[in-house]
Regions:
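N-terminal accessory regions of nucleic-acid-interacting proteins
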Residues: 1-69
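Conserved RNase H-like, two-metal-ion catalytic cores of nucleic-acid enzymes
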Residues: 61-132
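Acidic active-site catalytic centers that drive phospho-/nucleotidyl reactions
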Residues: 76-78, 142, 167, 232
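Conserved DEDDh/DEDDy metal-dependent 3′-5′ exonuclease domain
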Residues: 103-192
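Acidic, Mg2+-coordinating catalytic module of metal-dependent nucleases/exonucleases
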Residues: 180, 185-256
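Amphipathic alpha-helical repeat scaffolds of TPR domains
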Residues: 257-270, 287
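Alpha-helical repeat scaffolds
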Residues: 274-280
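Repeat-based scaffolding regions
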Residues: 280, 284-287
Length: 287
């Protein structure tokens, strides 16, 4: 057992070493490069590795509907508020398109409310031709908001509505809902993927960030929200990939009884109702 003097000496040695080396440096973040678009808005581009997407589980994730994985597009928005209505706009629409060379990320930033129609046109052009639109909890707010803004801008939402849509939240609740654990995107990233976010700016700060940008005219005021949006895009894509792995091969990929039973429930929902009903009747009838 160390004496008191030895403990003090060791503590002084550790303190001296820390003073020499300094505290761990914060991770260096690359600057966000805002490009001006022909429409007068801003575009931020980035690339990331693409996860493997297994088509075998897609039918279960889509409730039996048909779609392809040839041109997957992940969509996420940042808005000026959560109330909806005609006063709320999506000032940042992020798209992550999966291709053979990885994930191409395009984040469309509205330079001013007066240029919203042009930005929405750029988004529609980028989404057109996709075989699957992937989102997280967007069905109930973001997509209706985009449709409303398109109507107000006198533009058609047909290109957006024509793409089959997978909202990962519904699948995530089946596979990963647990008592006492929420199904927010950041929570699932940490709990399911083992990837807790570091130094992330919460989406709730989006309205204030856009207001600050409009006052200053400096798009760098939105850099933190652009990074947050990019994390949302990549997190949604990673969760979709994980879900498709589990649904494609439940017995090989499921890591818990909850995942296995959730996969069974999702696959069961793809069966025609008449077949499920007749099977239940046969099971209940006396032999």
């Amino acid at each position: 057992m160390l004496s008191r003097l030895e403990v003090v000496t060791e503590l002084r040695r550790v303190i001296a070493r820390l003073e020499r080396t300094g505290s761990p440096a914060a991770p260096v973040r690359p600057p966000v490069d805002f490009e001006r678009t022909p429409s007068g808005n801003y575009l931020v581009r980035a690339r990331a590795p693409a996860p493997t997407l297994r088509p075998g589980g897609l039918a279960a994730a889509l409730g039996g509907r048909v779609a392809g994985l040839e041109r997957v597009c992940v969509l996420d928005t940042e808005t000026t508020g959560l109330a909806g209505g005609t006063g709320t706009i999506a000032f940042l629409v992020g798209l992550a398109r999966v291709g053979p060379d990885g994930v191409a990320i395009e984040q469309h930033v509205c330079a001013s409310p007066a240029r919203e129609a042009e930005m929405l046109g750029d988004v529609l052009a980028a989404v057109a031709g996709s075989t699957l639109l992937v989102t997280f909890n967007v069905r109930s707010f973001d997509l209706p908001l985009l449709r409303t803004r398109l109507v107000l801008a006198r533009r058609s939402a047909a290109a957006l509505d024509a793409v089959p849509h997978l909202d990962v939240l519904g699948t995530a609740r089946r596979l990963w809902a647990r008592p006492g654990a929420d199904c927010r995107l950041v929570s699932l990233e940490a709990r399911v993927l083992g990837r807790p976010r570091q130094d992330d700016t919460p989406g709730s700060e989006a309205p204030a960030a856009y207001a600050a940008y409009l006052r200053s005219g400096d798009p760098r005021q939105l850099a933190a929200m652009v990074r947050h949006n990019r994390e949302d895009l990549l997190g949604t894509l990673a969760l979709a990939a994980r879900a498709l792995h589990v649904l494609d091969s439940p017995f090989a990929e499921a890591e818990s009884i909850g995942e296995l039973s959730g996969a069974a429930a999702l696959w069961s929902a793809t069966r025609p109702r008449s077949r499920r009903g007749s099977s239940a009747s046969r099971a209940a009838s006396p032999r």
